[in-house]
Amino acid sequence: MALLLQQRVLVELVLTFGGMVLLMMAESVVPRVRTLAETVPVARWLNNWALAVFNFFLVLWLVYLLTSSELVTHWVSTGPAPLSGMPPLVAFVVVFLVVEFLVYALHRAFHQVPWLWRLHAVHHLDTQVDVTTSHRHHSLELLLVMAVLIPVVTLLGPEPLVLLGYFVVRVTVILVSHSNLRLPRGLDRVLRWLVVTPDFHRLHHAADRRHTDSNYGTVTPWFDYLFGSATDLPYGEHDRLVTGLEYLRDTRDSRVDRLMLLPFRWHRLRSRRK
């Protein structure tokens, strides 16, 4: 358990921050929204990076607590672990489907339950969506998601390499799907049957609430198609898509300190209607 959690954090750390740098360079070469690529929003980038770094230190601290707990270690070692010893490909598919369904359901809940939305709105307040948006989350949202996923994955008991493989896929798709990267129309149409593409997910970040409450998939859009929550936009209209939310669009609202306090100041800030 200890080794598994440590490996997961290390892989996500390297992939996330290394991937962000590479995709930021790619965004400047083949941008989906050219007006975004023509600016250098240093302040916004710094705020998004700062929140991502803070959350990673929080995860590291939680991993330390979990791996040093004898109770947790005993629970893991005596648990059912139905995936242990399964063929790796079968175990990967099970982990993929179970976790992606849970994340899909949690994501819908974060949009539909008012107090959860106050946390998740931190992610959606970014008015310029690019790869740095991918890990812009309130820390309490991160803790709630981990509180659901860690026990489920632990009970499934997949081999470490299976879980690491899933996290590599997950982190990679999350980074690419948030990036301001232009994919050819035909490629996007094919890929979005398998994975969440930048265009598919950008629509989820639209200021228009009809689109905000759609396209919940994180790695795959399958559950959006299955439960009727997928929406689409003509390929040529993405350049004109207004992202962020219809309120709290002032650049000051995206400062790290304000983002962390947002859920607790929600009603007062919303009353400004900006």
Briefly describe each language-model feature range.
Residues G19-R32, A105-W115:
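Membrane-water interface of transmembrane alpha-helices
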Residues M25-L46:
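Membrane-interface helix-loop junction between the first two transmembrane segments
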Residues W45, T218-L226, V256-H267:
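A transmembrane-helix-recognition feature enriched in membrane-embedded lipid enzymes
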Residues V53-L66, T73, A81, G85-R240:
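Membrane-embedded catalytic scaffold of the fatty acid hydroxylase/desaturase
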Residues H238-K274:
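A membrane-cytosol interface segment of integral membrane proteins
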